[in-house]
């Protein structure tokens, strides 16, 4: 119930942040700049999804070289939670997704996150079901230890997938005893 309350509370904020991009009309390819390409991709993923996705958080790992042992001994590194999204593959074979997820953070408190993800996708084998991806996610999160104030995030993404299942991950950079966290989840496409 608490998770549902957090998601409901912050869904409106995330939706309001994404709304201007979703309302932007498409422009010709010759007129596009980097930001217009980004907003067009977000809007197309919102309007024309090919798949609906289930996100299942798998692991958080605090880089041991960047933390005192006393802290890592107390931190939660099993971020159970769930998320949902919608995604599509573009004509170049790259992945685009919109998602919302809630999981238990390092302090075992609920952390919602939502945003847009993009990955350049490679299929190095004859079997096109196998793929590797590198890209980014841009979104908004909120944490208990920051009083659930919405915080924008721009993070790297990497993945390895086969068929409808993808192991996707990011790294949250930081300073000593802060950040420097590897976070990964499974994404299942339907």
From Swiss-Prot:
Site residues by UniProt (Role in lipopolysaccharide recognition):
71
Q: Which residue positions are annotated as catalytic? A: 62, 105, 106
Q: Which GO terms describe its molecular function?
A: palmitoyltransferase activity
Any single biological process term in GO:
lipid A biosynthetic process
**Subcellular location as annotated:** Cell outer membrane
Role in the phospholipid gating (site feature) positions: 176
Q: Which GO terms describe its cellular component?
A: cell outer membrane
What start and end residues bound the annotated signal peptide?
A: 1-29
Query: Where do the TM regions start and end?
Result: none
Q: Does the keyword Acyltransferase apply?
A: yes
Keywords, sorted A to Z: Acyltransferase, Cell outer membrane, Membrane, Signal, Transferase
Q: What is its main location?
A: membrane
The induction text for this entry reads:
Regulated by the PhoP/PhoQ two-component regulatory system.
Family under the similarity heading:
Belongs to the lipid A palmitoyltransferase family.
What this chain does, per the record? Transfers a fatty acid residue from the sn-1 position of a phospholipid to the N-linked hydroxyfatty acid chain on the proximal unit of lipid A or its precursors. Required for resistance to cationic antimicrobial peptides (CAMPs). Modifications of lipid A with an acyl chain allow to evade host immune defenses by resisting antimicrobial peptides and attenuating the inflammatory response to infection triggered by lipopolysaccharide through the Toll-like receptor 4 (TLR4) signal transduction pathway.
Summarize the subunit comment: Homodimer.
- Please report the name of this protein according to its UniProt entry: Lipid A acyltransferase PagP
Name the species this protein comes from: Salmonella typhimurium (strain LT2 / SGSC1412 / ATCC 700720)
Q: What is the lineage of its organism?
A: Bacteria, Pseudomonadati, Pseudomonadota, Gammaproteobacteria, Enterobacterales
Gene behind this protein: pagP
């Amino acid at each position: 119930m608490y998770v549902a309350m957090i998601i409901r509370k912050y869904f409106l904020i995330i939706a309001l942040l994404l709304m201007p991009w979703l309302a932007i009309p498409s422009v010709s390819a010759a007129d596009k700049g980097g930001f217009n390409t980004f907003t067009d991709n977000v809007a197309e993923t919102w309007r024309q999804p090919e798949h609906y996705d289930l996100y299942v958080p798998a692991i958080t790992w605090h880089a041991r070289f960047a933390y005192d042992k006393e802290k890592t001994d107390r931190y939660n590194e099993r971020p159970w939670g769930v998320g949902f999204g919608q995604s599509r593959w573009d004509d170049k074979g790259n992945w685009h997704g919109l998602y919302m997820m809630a999981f238990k953070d390092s302090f075992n408190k609920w952390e919602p996150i939502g945003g847009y993800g993009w990955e350049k996708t490679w299929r190095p084998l004859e079997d096109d079901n196998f793929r590797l991806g590198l890209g980014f996610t841009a979104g908004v999160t909120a944490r208990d230890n920051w009083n659930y104030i919405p915080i924008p995030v721009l993070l790297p993404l990497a993945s390895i997938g086969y068929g409808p299942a993808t192991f996707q991950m990011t790294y949250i950079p930081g300073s000593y005893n802060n950040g420097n966290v590897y976070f990964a989840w499974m994404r299942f496409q339907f």
